[in-house]
A protein has these predicted regions:
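Sec/Tat signal peptide C-region and signal peptidase I cleavage site
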Residues: 14-18
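C-terminal domain-boundary segment and adjacent tail
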Residues: 58-60, 159, 220-291
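Sec-dependent N-terminal signal peptides
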Residues: 4-13
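Active-site beta->alpha N-cap acidic-glycine motif
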Residues: 19-134, 234, 250
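Acidic carboxylate-rich catalytic motifs and surrounding loops in phosphoryl-/glycosyl-chemistry enzymes
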Residues: 68-70, 161-162, 246-247
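Catalytic domains of cell-wall/extracellular-matrix polysaccharide-remodeling enzymes
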Residues: 74-76, 83, 100-241
Length: 291
């Protein structure tokens, strides 16, 4: 944290940075990551978690753009999306199946986007936003073909400049027994917020002190139902103003993408996850929830 504080002081010394701290909040994988509506208990939990996200946004007067996986809308969750839009927030297309364009051909991917478009058209706001799952834009063959389709169908690509990697922390929270999560969240929250802030400082470094606007990626998940308000307050305490995605795209910071050579997939389940490997943030093993 000391290194982060020193870097922050150096950035503050630059007049251009001190005067232009603006950020747009974007939320992927709506309606709600790894949620079920198959029992009254699951319905209640999903509703409470989603409502917490809405409340954090509305109580802090923060604009947001959400990206919907159309194939992940469980029975009874359409109302979540209506609630999000009716609260004044934007909704965009995040495909039907959450495919990784770095791993498939353009035609199948385009069909998946079109399928989502048909389902989401009653809810999507203007301008029509699209975000690539996994931030994967494809290779030299698939990328231009998909981009041409999106352009012809009046989509605006929503880039990311700060990736919270929250799915890694969310996976850790799912490993904690349900009744113990409230007590555990404060410990996890500290690490999570520190990580987001380190990602923010890296983004500001990439911007090279230019007066650009940042775009933060988080997910509609269990973790952020607890912590979104803290994320918002952290940015406000550091002097950031929250703006719309439309405003951010007028002069965005350098965007993050996943090269076509990288094929990492994060998978999701409901209350339990398992698997192997090492998490570079938490130092734990396990599968990762949707990115």
């Amino acid at each position: 944290m000391r290194k982060l504080s020193l870097l922050w002081l150096l950035l503050l010394a630059c007049n251009s940075f001190a005067q232009t701290r603006e950020i747009a909040l974007t939320i992927d994988d709506l309606p709600l990551v790894a949620s079920k509506m198959d029992t009254p208990g699951n319905q209640q939990r999903a509703t409470e978690r989603f409502n917490k996200i809405i409340e954090a946004l509305t109580q802090n007067h923060v604009p947001a753009t959400g990206f919907v996986i159309a194939g992940a809308i469980a029975k009874g969750q359409w109302v979540f999306l209506e609630q999000f839009r009716n609260a004044g927030f934007e909704l965009g297309n995040h495909t039907y199946s959450h495919y990784n364009l770095n791993q498939m051909n353009a035609d199948k991917y385009i069909a998946d986007v079109a399928r989502a478009d048909k389902i989401l058209s009653p809810l999507m706001t203007e301008p029509k936003y699209f975000r690539y799952p996994y931030l994967a834009e494809g290779n030299k063959v698939s990328k231009p073909k998909v981009l041409n389709y999106l352009t012809e169908n009046h989509y605006v690509i929503a880039p990311v400049t700060i990736d919270s990697k929250d799915f890694r922390f969310n996976e850790q929270l799912y490993k904690v027994p349900y009744r113990s999560r409230e007590a555990y969240i404060n410990k996890l929250k500290t690490r999570y917020l520190e990580y987001i802030w380190s990602q923010t400082l890296k983004a500001e470094q990439r911007a090279k002190d230019q007066p650009v606007k940042q775009i933060l990626l988080i997910h509609a998940n269990l973790l952020n139902s607890y912590v979104l308000g803290d994320i918002i307050q952290m940015y406000k305490q550091h002097g950031y103003t929250f703006i719309t995605l439309t405003e951010a795209l007028k002069n965005p910071a350098p965007a993050l993408t996943v090269p076509a050579s990288e094929n990492t997939i994060e998978k999701g389940t409901d209350e339990n996850t398992s698997g192997g490997g090492t998490d570079d943030v938490l130092g734990i093993g396990g599968q990762l929830l949707f990115h």
